[in-house]
Amino acid sequence: MEESQSELGVEPPLSQETFSDLWKLLPENNLLSSELSLAAVNDLLLSPVTNWLDENPDDASRVPAPPAATAPAPAAPAPATSWPLSSFVPSQKTYPGSYDFRLGFLHSGTAKSVTCTYSPALNKLFCQLAKTCPVQLWVSSPPPPGTRVRAMAIYKKSEYMTEVVRRCPHHERSSDYSDGLAPPQHLIRVEGNLRAEYLDDRNTFRHSVVVPYEPPEVGSDCTTIHYNFMCNSSCMGGMNRRPILTIITLEDASGNLLGRNSFEVRVCACPGRDRRTEEENFLKKGQSCPEPPPGSTKRALPTSTSSSPVQKKKPLDGEYFTLQIRGRERFEMFRELNDALELKDAQTARESGENRAHSSHLKSKKGQSPSRHKKPMFKREGPDSD
């Protein structure tokens, strides 16, 4: 068989050759050649890095270290917003001035349906949020041209007077009552007056609204300004149930004071109910009523027989008073009235004394004689009694 293949000149297949024959078939520049040593490989790969470090030794220290796999730190809470305190506390004392400046309010009851009501006994205005509150301005003579009316709110209690009265964060961000004219943090607004200016004092940080003074219309004796209070008295982050005062000042064009007046304000959901409750508590405590300024047009409290408690009659005291009366005829009238009252008191005292003596006499007589209706009881002794 072998002789026949050699004779025909056919070469055996590659799989039948030896390994040494296959090794010799590889090219001479093979990468797997034994002539390529490990040192040559290191020089080929590491020489660029070595040259860069030799040329820039300072940059090697600035090579950033790989970031460490640490847990993310919790976010720090946002700092609480602290509003600046005001170093200026405006006066709240009533000052009529040379123009006899005073305030007036419309008469309104204590029904649940009212949205704004004023209590003369408390000198306090009760109103709902963003509802119309008419305030009347009275003067004895027209002020000079350029006179302005300023409204500013301050806290009533002394421990909060340095804080600026502003709306709560909820109502500041709310767009329900935004008119685009007043800043969102202002509490007091003027309704229906495009000439109103809302001012933020850079020194005192206080908010105020200023409108030009307009003389009364024909047939009217006073000027009326409609104010709105844009936050409830119970709002957290705002007034927070702290009572406030609204100061109304009359100023000339240069800012000089011409008159001042003030009143307390409570912004609530039911003004009529709150006014009735506070007036009843006020009468129970027996506190002295704050006197309105002289010549004020503030309405008097309507007499109510249901809410006011019945006052007990006090006993007569022994004090004497002197009353100066002008005119002889009026003096005789009061003298006769006084004599009649003295006679009545004497008769009352005499009758009470006689009744007291008669009642004591009857009691003593009853104690001495037995009653005629009662029969005397005797003890009978029988034959069986021992």
UniProtKB/Swiss-Prot annotation:
Q: What is known of its domains?
A: The N-terminal and C-terminal disordered regions undergo liquid-liquid phase separation (LLPS) following homotetramerization and activation. Post-translational modifications, such as phosphorylation or lactylation affect the ability to undergo LLPS. The nuclear export signal acts as a transcriptional repression domain. The TADI and TADII motifs (residues 17 to 25 and 48 to 56) correspond both to 9aaTAD motifs which are transactivation domains present in a large number of yeast and animal transcription factors.
- Residues with the modification N6,N6-dimethyllysine, per the entry, are 363, 366, 375
The subunit field of the Swiss-Prot or TrEMBL record says: Forms homodimers and homotetramers. Binds DNA as a homotetramer. Interacts with AXIN1. Probably part of a complex consisting of TP53, HIPK2 and AXIN1. Interacts with histone acetyltransferases EP300 and methyltransferases HRMT1L2 and CARM1, and recruits them to promoters. Interacts (via C-terminus) with TAF1; when TAF1 is part of the TFIID complex. Interacts with ING4; this interaction may be indirect. Found in a complex with CABLES1 and TP73. Interacts with HIPK1, HIPK2, and TP53INP1. Interacts with WWOX. Interacts with USP7 and SYVN1. Interacts with HSP90AB1.
- Where does this chain carry the motif Nuclear export signal? 332-343
Skewed-composition ranges (Basic and acidic residues): 345-357
Q: Which residues carry this modification: N6-methyllysine?
A: 363, 365, 375
What residues bear Phosphothreonine in this entry?
18, 277
In this UniProt entry, the residues modified to Symmetric dimethylarginine are: 328, 330
The UniProt annotation puts motif [KR]-[STA]-K motif at 363-365
Q: Where is this cross-link: Glycyl lysine isopeptide (Lys-Gly) (interchain with G-Cter in ubiquitin)?
A: 24, 284-285, 344
- State the residue spans of region: Interaction with DNA: 266-273
User: Where is the cross-link described as Glycyl lysine isopeptide (Lys-Gly) (interchain with G-Cter in SUMO)?
Assistant: 379
Please give the positions of the paired cysteines in each disulfide bond.
Answer: none
Q: What is the lineage of its organism?
A: Eukaryota, Metazoa, Chordata, Craniata, Vertebrata
Q: Where is this region: Interaction with E4F1?
A: 249-287
Record region (Interaction with CCAR2): 1-313
- Which gene produces this protein? TP53
Q: What is the annotated localization of this protein?
A: Cytoplasm; Nucleus; Nucleus, PML body; Endoplasmic reticulum
Ranges of biased composition (kind: Basic residues): 358-377
Task: List the protein's name.
Answer: Cellular tumor antigen p53
* Binding-site residues for Zn(2+), renumbered to this chain: 168, 171, 231, 235
Q: Which residues carry this modification: N6-acetyllysine?
A: 112, 298, 314, 366, 374-375
Which residues are recorded as modified (Phosphoserine)?
15, 20, 33, 37, 47, 175, 262, 308, 385
Q: Main role?
A: Multifunctional transcription factor that induces cell cycle arrest, DNA repair or apoptosis upon binding to its target DNA sequence. Acts as a tumor suppressor in many tumor types; induces growth arrest or apoptosis depending on the physiological circumstances and cell type. Negatively regulates cell division by controlling expression of a set of genes required for this process. One of the activated genes is an inhibitor of cyclin-dependent kinases. Apoptosis induction seems to be mediated either by stimulation of BAX and FAS antigen expression, or by repression of Bcl-2 expression.
Annotated region Interaction with HIPK1: the residues are 92-363
Q: Specify where the region named Interaction with USP7 lies, as residue ranges.
A: 352-356
Kindly list the positions at which N6-lactoyllysine occurs in this protein.
Answer: 112, 131
Annotated region described as Interaction with AXIN1, given as residue ranges: 108-285
